């Protein structure tokens, strides 16, 4: 499967690299070195990292993530993923959950203002939830209000890309929803100048539309740069905004075309698809064994 041809950079374009789920501790070293080279060569206007910098929020994992982020030398915003909250230290998880981001705290949940475009954060990873599976997303009223206020404050004519970790898809009942409050958030975003919602979490790229009572919202998911692949090789998204059209390419080391990289629905988690009906990318690089988790 041949890769998409790389278009020449239009000076009037805004170029954004959408990276997710690097999972330092189980990172793919070839993939992160390649992305670093791509950033140095193409000099994107911004890099949006949509969560799960680490595997288990260990100090050494954050130290490696900090070194990598600092080496990129471009405007960056980082969303917090469920894997980035302290896993073993519950006191720290509840009282100082972002403590281990020291060194890159200035870019955590940071709004980036670009020519005609803003990247606005929306927090979906929380310390605790009234359900057993805390790895899933939960949007609080305060987090949604903060995001909407930021979008409403943008200058007239400026579009927004909303950066989250969990896709804003509610699957099943409230107890099993991938992101509790996701549909409410999408409905509110549909009433605003939002180009799309950038997410991670599920380790496969996608470019889908979710309907709401106020119209459709584009949902753009990035793959992973870790060893924990689902059905596609490690990848990131290259976004180009020319003032009218937002194009998305799923860049990858496997030279696979974007359309062969993207799944056609949002799965409930990042585990490789083993059951009938689970979304699988056309390239179908499902690992024979489940990836490591530690």
Regions found by a protein language model. Name each.
Residues 151-171:
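Short acidic, glycine-rich surface-loop motifs adjacent to enzyme active sites
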Residues 25-27, 55-60, 82-90, 126-132, ...:
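Active-site environment of divalent metal-dependent phosphoester hydrolases
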Residues 1-71, 87-88:
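N-terminal active-site segment of His-dependent metallophosphoesterases
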Residues 63-146, 154, 188-190, 213-215, ...:
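Extended active-site neighborhood of metal-dependent phosphoesterases/phosphodiesterases
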Residues 18-20, 47-52, 76-82, 123, ...:
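Active-site neighborhood of phospho(di)ester-bond hydrolases with catalytic His/Asp-centered motifs
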Residues 174-244:
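Conserved beta-sheet core of the metallophosphoesterase superfamily
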Residues 1, 241-294:
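A short C-terminal boundary segment appended to hydrolase-like catalytic domains
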Residues 32-33, 61-65, 139-142, 176-185:
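Charged helix-capping and loop-helix junction motifs
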């Amino acid at each position: 499967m041949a890769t998409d041809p790389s278009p020449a950079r239009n000076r009037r374009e805004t170029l954004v690299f959408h990276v997710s789920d690097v999972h330092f501790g189980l990172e793919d070293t070839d993939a992160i070195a390649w992305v670093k080279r791509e950033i140095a060569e193409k000099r994107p206007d911004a890099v949006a990292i949509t969560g799960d910098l680490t595997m288990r929020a260990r100090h050494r994992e954050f130290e490696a993530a900090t070194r990598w982020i600092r080496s990129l030398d471009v405007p960056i915003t980082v969303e917090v993923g469920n894997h980035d909250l302290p896993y073993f230290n519950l006191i720290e998880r509840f009282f100082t959950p972002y403590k281990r981001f020291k060194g890159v705290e200035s870019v955590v949940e940071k709004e980036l203002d670009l020519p005609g475009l803003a990247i606005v954060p929306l927090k979906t990873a929380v310390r605790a939830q009234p359900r057993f599976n805390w790895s899933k997303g939960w949007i609080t009223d305060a987090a949604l209000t903060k995001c909407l206020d930021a979008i409403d404050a943008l200058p007239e004519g400026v579009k927004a890309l909303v950066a989250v970790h969990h896709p804003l898809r509610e699957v099943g009942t409230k107890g099993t929803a991938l992101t509790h409050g996701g549909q409410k958030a999408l409905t509110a975003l549909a009433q605003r100048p939002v180009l799309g919602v950038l997410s991670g979490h599920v380790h496969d790229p996608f470019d889908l539309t979710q309907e709401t009572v106020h119209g459709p919202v584009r949902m753009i998911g990035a793959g992973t740069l870790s060893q924990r692949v689902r059905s596609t090789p490690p990848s990131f998204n290259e976004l180009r905004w020319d003032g009218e059209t937002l194009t998305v390419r799923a860049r990858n080391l496997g030279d696979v075309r974007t359309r062969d990289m993207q799944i056609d629905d949002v799965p409930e988690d990042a585990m490789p698809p083993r059951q009938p009906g689970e979304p699988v990318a056309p390239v179908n690089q499902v690992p024979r064994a489940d990836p490591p988790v530690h």
